[in-house]
Amino acid sequence: MKPIQVGLLGIGTVGSGTFNVLKRNQPEIQRRAGRGIAITMVADLDTARAQAVVGDAARVVSDARAVIANPEIDIVVELIGGYGIAKALVMEAIAAGKHVVTANKALLAVHGTEIFAAAREKGVVVAFEAAVAGGIPIIKSLREGLTANRIEWIAGIVNGTTNFILSEMRDKGLDFDAVLKQAQALGYAEADPTFDIEGVDAAHKTTLMSAIAFGIPVQFDGAYVEGITRLQAADITYAEQLGYRIKLLGITRRQPTGIELRVHPTLIPMKRLIANVEGPMNAVMVHGDAVGTTLYYGKGAGSEATASAVIADLVDITRLHTALPNHRVPHLAFQPDELATTPILPMDQVISSFYLRLQVADQTGVLARITGILAGHDISIDALLQRESAEGEAQTDVIILTHDTVEGKMNKAIAQMQALPTVLAPIVRIRKEELN
């Protein structure tokens, strides 16, 4: 049988990994797919680099549209990234009747509804396992492996850059800026790391998982996004003393009135497996009503780890190449006409427990005023830690862990405490999740 012919748009880190793994493991992959899969055309602006990777195994061009226009190409793999030209090329590939594989979480989180609708209309597949958590097969697990379950919540470390930074801040006692420079030197962080450190990348991925888990359209514009740039080494140390680790988590949870969709630094009990995910590794916890809590762990990025997910999608499409469109697994797990209109909850309606760090004047009565404000907003205290002041020191840190409360109440309490003349610096607030 004639091999499935693949056109590759972009042959950087992931593209070269995809070509190399497919070439190296071709016999195994063919036995699993039931048919050969061959990358026969590659588009990259750096044609010399591309030619050095593929040799004479594929035709190299500088114009991506030449790949899409080639009637011999069955599947287009988009590895360019971003929202602009990548969206145009994906839509053109769909219009040309090509299946699409992409690792572009930003594109799908923002434009997924439009892209999936176009794919349904043309009877083609848009596959995106590589868009979330690199080599971890979390999309397939949510869409197929857990299909018997009512998913209750997902909590994931889905950005390796921020997890590396937080791990190093804890282990070496360094502040954020110093560790960011180290991460950039080691290649774990981009020259412009904004999407990573501000939580945007994790929010793109969490948006996609939320849509699949709860059968809703992708709604990135409803996500709450907070990064790690304001975290200090002191907060990580205090959290450890209280039995917690701080991780940047993507969280989505089913509630009676809507869906939580949020990314922010989070205190997690040290005893949880996910609290012990270190360096650039990723992990995703999923809680289903039948299966309970499951954990998926592995490399969230890297050439061959992400290529593993890209090729898994190529194999899936090869297997269903002759299947009727209505016999395929839906893009977002639920049938398109069964997607719910459940809203994303505003952040001030979300219930969390909190870590608060207040830098206060070392005076009598300060603590009583702070606890009185919390009590006035029906916020109860779970634990309290006060740093011993050095002799002659006029200020100290007060650390408070609260029980669950509504975010809106906490916002009002923080504003009231911040106005006290004895509170000497902006109050640090980090949400806490037990992940039971």
Where are these regions (language model features)?
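Rossmann-fold NAD(P)-binding glycine/threonine-rich loop
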Residues: 85-96, 105-143
